[in-house]
Structure formats: C-alpha cells, structure tokens
Amino acid sequence: MARKPGRMYKKFSGPAYTRREYMGGVPGVKVAQFDMGNLTEELPIAVTLVVNETCQIRHDALEAARISANRYLLNDVGKTNYRFKVRVYPHQVLRENKQATGAGADRVSDGMRRAFGKAVGTAARVYEGQGVFTIWVNRANFEKAKEAMRRAGHKLPTPYRVVVEKGAELVK
C-alpha cells in the first residue's frame, strides 16, 4: 500500500504519542546520522535553518533534507571544513488506519470501527522559531552553507528562514 502524503501528518493537536514501550511494531527512525563533518574543530560561523510554522516533520523528510545538504557540503566544501547537526529527533509515532480497497473490500474492512491505527512512522514536532539544522563553517564557505540550507529547506513541509546564529559580524 502506498505511503500517505506528508500533509496528512503536518498539523498536530493533543498530547505527544511517544511511549514506545507500550506499542508494538514501531518502525525505526530513518535519520541515519545526527552529526556530520568535522566534529572536533571549532568553526566561527553558525548558520541555522529555522521553521516559521509549528508542524510535524516526518523522519523521511528529515532524512531527505539531511542527505541533500550534507551531500552538497561534502562535494563543494570538503569533509574537514564544516560541521552539520540535525537538532530535532523524531519522537512522535504516527499511526494509520489502513483501509482495504478493491473488489470485496466492504466485506473485509471494518471501516471506522476500532480505527486506532497501526504505527507507520515517526515525526519530529517543531515549533515556530525552532532550529532544525545547524551548519558551522568558516567565512570562505558561508555562501555554500546558506545554499545547503536552502536545498534542505525545500524538502521540509513548512516555510523556513536561514539565520546566522554565530559570527554574523564576520559575514557583513
């Protein structure tokens, strides 16, 4: 069965659904790494992707954005000239009430009876003004870091802005 579109899980209300010890069959988190690049060197400029709306970001979207930005930085800047961090973790478990389709589905399906749903993935709850990714670079690679953030932002289900958190005086 096909995955449901991300817009179905974008908005949230009610308490978080995160207690995996009470659930069975929760899929693993797709985000492979949360820290990339040169983790030891102190770099002077920090560029952060900040969301403009409160929403949920599925782990698929986080991983797609992470891969996009990291690959761009790795190819254009080099592994030793940046540090990239994913600042949110997809704790929220997403559920789906699977519906049978096709011939005879009405005999097999329960419809909306017992419609709690099964775990199909995870998402990170982010709030307006929260940072999702941060890249630390030197002055020479500042524009490339901004471009990497732009590429990552296109993979997210919410409007975003790129903010210089540290070293703003170096890039003026």
Swiss-Prot record:
<dbReference type="GO" id="GO:1990904">
    <property type="term" value="C:ribonucleoprotein complex"/>
</dbReference>
<keyword id="KW-0687">Ribonucleoprotein</keyword>
<protein>
    <recommendedName>
        <fullName>Large ribosomal subunit protein uL16</fullName>
    </recommendedName>
</protein>
<dbReference type="InterPro" id="IPR047873">
    <property type="entry name" value="Ribosomal_uL16"/>
</dbReference>
<dbReference type="InterPro" id="IPR001197">
    <property type="entry name" value="Ribosomal_uL16_euk_arch"/>
</dbReference>
<dbReference type="GO" id="GO:0006412">
    <property type="term" value="P:translation"/>
</dbReference>
<keyword id="KW-0689">Ribosomal protein</keyword>
<dbReference type="InterPro" id="IPR016180">
    <property type="entry name" value="Ribosomal_uL16_dom"/>
</dbReference>
<dbReference type="InterPro" id="IPR018255">
    <property type="entry name" value="Ribosomal_uL16_CS_euk_arc"/>
</dbReference>
<dbReference type="InterPro" id="IPR036920">
    <property type="entry name" value="Ribosomal_uL16_sf"/>
</dbReference>
<dbReference type="Pfam" id="PF00252">
    <property type="entry name" value="Ribosomal_L16"/>
</dbReference>
<dbReference type="GO" id="GO:0003735">
    <property type="term" value="F:structural constituent of ribosome"/>
</dbReference>
<dbReference type="InterPro" id="IPR022981">
    <property type="entry name" value="Ribosomal_uL16_arc"/>
</dbReference>
<comment type="similarity">
    <text>Belongs to the universal ribosomal protein uL16 family.</text>
</comment>
<dbReference type="GO" id="GO:0005840">
    <property type="term" value="C:ribosome"/>
</dbReference>
